[in-house]
Structure formats: structure tokens, C-alpha cells
């Protein structure tokens, strides 16, 4: 069964990442794994569980939590690189509250709750708290899409196909 915890996995890099600060200000049951947060959070530093978590431990954490918070670094947004943890969280059936990223919204228009400011972040939290089963159902509907298009195996197969294509097209280079 799902717990009550909101999760954030990521380093601060000395940057006040808004979704984390808003969650702390709102006294949400946030648990953080990442470096650089204790100094930034002051009295809320008890939210920091550790500066690191093994990748092998993340799925169990995702399966036991209520929701995860996500944001993208500016360069990721500039180039529309979707944070890979979103796929991991959704594959584990975990709802995601994320900043707006056009590429992400194109992939998951309904399965992720999006914010672009503090008010929208609060609306996402209200949606989680008031309509959790509906949000969770939208997340669970994504499993076939994730498995078919975004699994490790699918991505590895695509990379091999790209390499093979270029090797064949450029056989004169060999």
C-alpha cells in the first residue's frame, strides 16, 4: 500500500529548487535524497534522509511513497531533455508532480501533474490529496506505453539499430 511520503531525489547544486522549497514551506511529508540540502533547508533539514541513494533501492522507495516531486535543470528544459526518473517513477506506479516541460507533456499529457509556479504547484498537491485514486489510475494506465516505448530493453535496441544503420551506411569508413 502507498504511504503518505512525498519524495525528491536530486542534489541542490547550491540552487534553491522551487518545488522542494514549496513542499518544505507547506510542511508536506517530504523525504529528500540528495547532497546540498541541509544547509539550504535550515530547520527543515530533517527532511533530508541521505545525500545518496543506490539506484537499486529507488524502485522500492517509489512503490512505497505517495508521490514524487520533479523539476528539470534549465539546460534540460532548453533542450527538452526529460528527466529519466519520471519514467522510473511512473513504471513503479508512482504519481509525479513536475515542472512544465513540453516534451514531457507530449509524452504524458494526463499522467503527470504539471506546475509552472507556486499556485499551480499547490493545485497539484490538492489534486494528489483530494483525488489520489484518479491520479493513480492515470499513472497505472501508462505501464503498457512505458514498457513498449521507454523500457531499458527498447532503448538499448534502438541504440543498436542506430549504430548498425550508420555502420552499414558508412561501410566505406571501415
Spell out what each predicted region is.
Residues 1-110:
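Nucleotide-sugar donor-binding catalytic core of glycosyltransferases
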Residues 19, 85, 124, 141-142:
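Short, hydrophobic/aromatic alpha-helical segments in well-folded domains
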Residues 56-59, 87, 119, 133, ...:
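Residues in well-ordered alpha-helical elements
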Residues 61, 124-127, 162:
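CheY-like receiver
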Residues 108, 125, 139:
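Short, flexible helix/strand-to-coil boundary loops that buttress conserved ligand/catalytic motifs
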Residues 112-119, 127-132:
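Conserved acidic donor-binding segment of nucleotide-sugar-dependent glycosyltransferases
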Residues 130-163, 167-171:
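A charged, aromatic-enriched C-terminal amphipathic alpha-helix characteristic of glycosyltransferases
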Amino acid at each position: 500500500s502507498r504511504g503518505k511520503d512525498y519524495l525528491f531525489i536530486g542534489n541542490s547544486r547550491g540552487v534553491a529548487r522551487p518545488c522542494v522549497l514549496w513542499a518544505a514551506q507547506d510542511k508536506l511529508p517530504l523525504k529528500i535524497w540528495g547532497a546540498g540540502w541541509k544547509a539550504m533547508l535550515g530547520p527543515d533539514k530533517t527532511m533530508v534522509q541521505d545525500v545518496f541513494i543506490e539506484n537499486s533501492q529507488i524502485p522500492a522507495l517509489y512503490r512505497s511513497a505517495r508521490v514524487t516531486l520533479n523539476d528539470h535543470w534549465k539546460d534540460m528544459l532548453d533542450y527538452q531533455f526529460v528527466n529519466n526518473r519520471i519514467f522510473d517513477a511512473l513504471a513503479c506506479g508512482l504519481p509525479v508532480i513536475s515542472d512544465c516541460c513540453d516534451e514531457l507533456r507530449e509524452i504524458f499529457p494526463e499522467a503527470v501533474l504539471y506546475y509552472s509556479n507556486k499556485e499551480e504547484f499547490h493545485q497539484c498537491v490538492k489534486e494528489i490529496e483530494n483525488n489520489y485514486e484518479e491520479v493513480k489510475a492515470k499513472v497505472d494506465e501508462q505501464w503498457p506505453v512505458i514498457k513498449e516505448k521507454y523500457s531499458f530493453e527498447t532503448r538499448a535496441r534502438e541504440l543498436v539499430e542506430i549504430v548498425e544503420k550508420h555502420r552499414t551506411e558508412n561501410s566505406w569508413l571501415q
